[in-house]
UniProtKB/Swiss-Prot annotation:
Residues 625-801 form the PCI domain. Residues 215-224 have a biased composition (Polar residues). Residues 12-22, 169-189, 203-214 have a biased composition (Acidic residues). It comes from Caenorhabditis briggsae. One of its GO terms (molecular function) is translation initiation factor activity. Residues 884-894 have a biased composition (Basic residues). Component of the eukaryotic translation initiation factor 3 (eIF-3) complex. Belongs to the eIF-3 subunit C family. It comes from the Eukaryota. GO terms for biological process: formation of cytoplasmic translation initiation complex; translational initiation. The lineage of its organism: Eukaryota, Metazoa, Ecdysozoa, Nematoda, Chromadorea. This is Eukaryotic translation initiation factor 3 subunit C. Component of the eukaryotic translation initiation factor 3 (eIF-3) complex, which is involved in protein synthesis of a specialized repertoire of mRNAs and, together with other initiation factors, stimulates binding of mRNA and methionyl-tRNAi to the 40S ribosome. The eIF-3 complex specifically targets and initiates translation of a subset of mRNAs involved in cell proliferation. Residues 855-870 have a biased composition (Gly residues). PANTHER family: EUKARYOTIC TRANSLATION INITATION FACTOR 3, SUBUNIT 8 EIF3S8 -RELATED, EUKARYOTIC TRANSLATION INITIATION FACTOR 3 SUBUNIT C-RELATED.
Length: 894
């Protein structure tokens, strides 16, 4: 309909048409305005950022580096390997952009490469941490290490990495790329006032045009003009959006101010002329009223009030300790007596132990030293005065804190505090880095702890006649001193320390009723004797205690101590030259392949088999580092003992089909060495012993000695013994003797007579020693020979077959076994006159008990039915007897 006819329509039609047109126009305008606002929004509300391509690449690299660092912190090496490949590809793509803009290698990228390389190398060298990795992480570790090394070398980053290691960035330092990262975010300045006025005018004109259209939209010229103005305005806004602006630089100080967090401070409003005082969150505890006299009752009441907050969740533990210390100062200032002072001091010690929310958490070193000083002060006070009795047998009603005419009686035990303090020191050492100076500093506290334990022992001996101690507490004090003494080797005053050790152990043997402390004291005593080379006494004490029979029923800590004692006893036997005894003692630990775990020197290598709680318990049982037994030394001693025992045994049983092994682990090492296609010079102690074993098997004792005693072995093994020269002489002597025995057993079928003088010169032994060794071999029937004294010769009887004869016998045995196996395989396939019924396949069914009673050799009767053949029988189930027991049929081989 044209507008001319539309003007003449009725009012109702006009109103309805106006509404329709307005709605249509409003919807169209709103849709276009939304699209325009989407584009123009950043300019009006936010500051638009124009960034260079270099900055975008920097952001991409930093994002990938952050992902890799997250994977490193989570110890996800598989994800770290994938992330490193992605990062390397992204960096290679970005190098062209960097070269185009004359940008060198970013320092943050070099820093990341150094961090990852250090992390991977540290993890590679740490055997315990590497063993604790999962299977996927273990597989990813080696490729990651190789890729990282190859990437740095191929991309020419070796010099940059070395320069960074020489001058690393400090913590919190930002590289120029990091500092300019935000500078590159160039910001568009806000619109000028003139431009804002222009916008306001445009908006007003737009609103005016809208109003005119709403009231007088029927006129064609006005409508066209308003549409043109609106289009011009929209195009102007589009032009402004895509227009490049001039940028202004902000100072770095302004940017740093923007980075700082804005702290909103609430204003203190004054109302009704009242003075308002800001109150802190922590309540300031007012202990006493200034107008009140501080007496014993007031102090006890205030102490109970402070102690009532103990253990509550809302209680500040540090503030609780401070309150008790303030009470102690007031009590000493007012001179309220020893009873109050000792009671408050004991409460302070308990509060210091409770600073940690969890018992499993270890105490901070500063808190430990503070507690140690407090316990030491209280113990000095208890030793100097005999008017104070501190015992767990007293109840709270029986306490006497204020009556000076009587003895002060206080509930508590200073011995339990000393025991718990000793446990806290062990936790601190367990959680400290054993390869740092921090561990050494913390280890110095053990000296103070030992002095405190000796002081507690003196206090027990002074007050034990009063009956204020429990028997178990007294045994614990003696046991603590034993546990701080038994593993230490004493160069000086050995006699005094040995007497002290005997005295302490005898005290526990007498007083303890639970047997656990007696067992531990016995094991510590044996350990102490073994460390100080008292071999026979230590062995007899261990055998008399029968610990090897009852240790399986003991607790885990006692089993760990037993394992440590057995290892130390084996090392002691080796130092004395008792090779077989040393081998037996060390084999119990070395054959399990879990030596560190059994000695509580490391957590198990398979943590997935244990729950988190079990793993935490295992970590709490770990022995501090300064008490460790050198596992590498122990393994080397075990392998040397195995060599001295196994090589002569192998020579005597060379051609036996089934020979007995004395050491499976030693044979495993020999087999692994034989499998190697190329054998280089030995590097570690294990390879030295294997090479020496091969030389001994050939009778070359000098080469064997050179492998065992050299500079490298001196540093790793022999210098760790306090009598290193004696031990090395003993080992060389045993190598000569066992090499002689191996030589005679190997070549006994070759010689008819051997001169003793020749043997003595060959193995650098005296004629007397050679005669003694050969005589012992003849007596033990290891060698079939006779000593001819007039000629000083060894005459071989040659009863044993020669090497060729032994090989022929072995071959005949194997052929006989092969023939028997073939007969058994072919026997079920050969026919025996055709099918004779189902019983013919089961030889055990040839004859039955019922058939014997009938007097027949087989089943001839009729069962379950009519005749089955021409003679009226169902079948013949066997015609031969003689076997009443049914044997299972051998499996058929095809």
């Amino acid at each position: 309909m044209s507008r001319f006819y539309r003007r003449g329509a009725s009012d109702s039609d006009t109103d309805s048409s106006e509404d329709e047109v307005e709605e249509l126009k409003a919807n169209k305008s709103a849709k276009f305005r939304d699209d325009l606002d989407f584009m123009a929004g950043p300019e009006e509300d936010e500051k638009r950022v124009v960034r260079a391509q270099k900055d975008k690449k920097f952001d991409e690299l930093k994002s990938l580096i952050k992902q890799n660092r997250d994977a490193k912190s989570n110890k996800d090496l598989n994800k770290l390997l994938t992330g490193f490949d992605t990062l390397a590809k992204a960096y290679d793509k970005s190098k062209t952009i960097f070269q185009r803009q004359n940008v060198t290698n970013p320092r943050f990228y070099i820093r990341f490469l150094v961090e990852i390389e250090d992390y991977v190398n540290k993890l590679w060298e740490d055997k315990e941490a590497k063993a604790a990795l999962s299977k996927n992480n273990t597989k990813a570790l080696s490729p990651l290490r190789q890729k990282l090394k190859k990437y740095i070398k191929d991309h020419g980053l070796t010099d940059l990495v070395s320069d960074y290691r020489a001058n690393p960035d400090e913590d919190g330092y930002e590289t120029p790329e990091d500092e300019n990262d935000e500078d590159d975010f160039e910001e568009v300045p806000e619109a000028s006032p003139g431009r804002q006025a222009e916008r306001a005018a445009d908006s007003e004109s737009e609103s005016d045009s809208d109003d005119d259209d709403s009231f007088n939209w029927s006129s064609e010229p006005d409508t066209n003009s308003s549409d043109d103005e609106e289009n011009v305005t929209k195009m102007e806004q589009l032009r402004r959006y895509f227009l490049k602006k001039e940028f202004r630089e902000e100072s770095k100080d302004d940017k740093k101010d923007k980075r700082k967090r804005v702290i909103k401070v609430k204003e203190v409003v004054e109302e009704d002329d009242d003075d308002w005082t800001p109150v802190s969150r922590e309540k300031s505890v007012v202990h006493f009223d200034p107008n009140e006299e501080v007496t014993h009752d007031v102090m006890i009441k205030k102490l109970n009030e402070v102690m009532s907050a103990r253990g509550k969740r809302t209680t500040d533990r540090n503030q609780h300790v401070a309150n008790l210390q303030k009470l102690l100062e007031v009590a000493e200032e007012k001179q309220l007596g020893l009873g109050i002072s000792v009671k408050i001091s004991f409460c302070i010690i308990s509060a210091l132990f409770e600073l940690n929310a969890k018992i499993s958490d270890y105490m901070e070193y500063e808190t430990f030293m503070n507690t140690l000083r407090t316990v030491n002060t209280l113990l000095d006070l208890l030793i100097t005065t005999d008017r104070v009795k501190l015992s767990v047998t007293y109840a709270e009603e029986d306490e006497n804190l204020k009556d000076e005419n009587e003895e002060y009686r206080i509930q508590g035990s200073i011995l339990i505090a000393v025991q718990r303090l000793d446990g806290e020191l062990a936790k601190i050492l367990q959680n400290a880095d054993c390869h740092s100076n921090d561990y050494i500093e913390k280890l110095k506290a053990e000296k103070d702890m030992c002095q405190l334990i000796e002081k507690a022992e003196n206090y027990v001996e002074l007050r034990n006649h009063l009956g204020i101690f429990d028997k178990h507490e007294v045994c614990k004090v003696y046991m603590m001193r034993i546990e701080h003494t038994y593993y230490k080797y004493q160069d000086q005053n050995v006699g005094e320390v040995a007497k002290t050790m005997d005295y302490l152990c005898n005290k526990i043997y007498t007083l303890d009723d639970e047997k656990r402390l007696r067992q531990r004291a016995m094991l510590c005593h044996v350990y102490f004797l073994a460390v100080h080379d008292k071999w026979h006494r230590a062995r007899d004490l261990l055998l008399m205690s029968h610990m090897q029979a009852i240790v399986d029923h003991s607790d885990v800590d006692t089993q760990i101590l037993y394992n440590r004692t057995i290892c130390q006893l084996g090392l002691c036997a080796f130092r004395h030259g008792f090779i077989r005894e040393a081998h037996q003692g060390l084999s119990e630990i070395q054959n399990t392949q879990r030596a560190k775990e059994l000695l509580a020197q490391a957590v198990g290598t398979r943590p997935h088999e244990k729950t988190a709680e079990q793993e935490k318990i295992d970590r709490s049982r770990q022995v501090p580092y300064h008490m460790h037994i050198n596992v590498e030394l122990m393994e080397c001693v075990y392998l040397i003992c195995s060599m001295l025992l196994e090589i002569p045994h192998m020579a005597s049983c060379e051609f036996e089909m089934r020979r007995r092994m004395l050491s499976r682990s030693f044979h495993y090492q020999l087999k692994q060495s034989e499998k190697a296609s190329l054998t280089g010079p030995p590097e570690n102690t294990r390879e030295h012993v294997v090479a020496a074993s091969k030389a001994m098997l050939n009778g070359d004792w000098k080469k064997c000695k050179d492998y065992i005693v050299n500079e490298k072995m001196n540093q790793k093994v022999w210098n760790l013994f306090h009598n290193a020269d004696q031990v090395k002489d003993m080992v060389v002597r045993r190598i000569q003797e066992e090499s002689l025995r191996t030589y005679l057993l190997t070549y006994s079928t070759v010689y008819s007579t051997v001169s003793l003088k020749k043997l003595a010169s060959l193995f650098d032994l005296s004629k007397k020693d050679v005669h003694s060794i050969i005589s012992k071999m003849i007596i033990q029937e290891e060698l079939s020979a006779t000593l001819d004294e007039p000629t000083d010769c060894l005459i071989m009887h040659r009863v044993e077959p020669s090497r060729l004869q032994m090989l022929a016998l072995n071959l005949s045995d194997k052929l006989q076994t092969l023939a028997e196996n073939n007969e058994q395989i072919l026997e079920p396939r050969t026919g025996r006159g055709g099918y004779q019924g189902p019983g013919s396949w089961f030889p055990g069914r040839n004859e039955r008990q019922g058939d014997k009673q009938k007097g027949s050799g087989g089943f001839q009767g009729e069962r379950r039915g009519g005749p089955g053949g021409p003679d009226g029988k169902r079948g013949n189930w066997g015609s031969q007897g003689g076997q009443q027991r049914r044997h299972p049929q051998k499996p058929r081989a095809f």
